[in-house]
């Protein structure tokens, strides 16, 4: 009987890559904030209600994206680990 070879390490690495991309969003967020501050006059000047609301909304949106991406990456990694554990259990039972 042939062996089935699953690449659980690749799945785990994919989950880690998703989580790393989520973490990298902070750099993008800060770059956008710098641009928003430079263009503050568009919203009525830095410190204006519209400017502050835009910054708050932007931060909230980035936080939501980060949380969802990080959570998805964790789920992918947990699924990989769970599948690998199940595979080892079944494999040892068949040995």
UniProtKB/Swiss-Prot annotation:
Database matches in SUPFAM superfamilies: EsxAB dimer-like
A Pfam match: WXG100
Residues covered by region (Disordered): 72-95
Gene3D superfamilies, per the entry: ESAT-6-like
InterPro entries: ESAT-6-like_Myco, ESAT-6-like_sf, T7SS_ESAT-6-like
Entry similarity comment: Belongs to the WXG100 family.
UniProt protein name: Putative ESAT-6-like protein X
Protein's organism: Mycobacterium leprae (strain TN)
Lineage per the UniProt record: Bacteria, Bacillati, Actinomycetota, Actinomycetes, Mycobacteriales
């Amino acid at each position: 009987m042939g062996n089935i070879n699953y690449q659980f390490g690749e799945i785990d690495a994919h989950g880690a890559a998703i989580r790393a991309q989520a973490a990298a969003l902070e750099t993008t967020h800060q770059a956008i904030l710098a641009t928003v501050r430079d263009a503050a006059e568009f919203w009525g000047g830095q410190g204006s209600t519209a400017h502050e609301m835009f910054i708050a909304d932007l931060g909230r949106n980035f936080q939501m994206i980060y949380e969802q991406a990080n959570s998805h990456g964790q789920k992918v990694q947990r699924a990989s680990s769970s599948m690998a554990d199940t595979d080892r259990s079944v494999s040892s039972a068949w040995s």
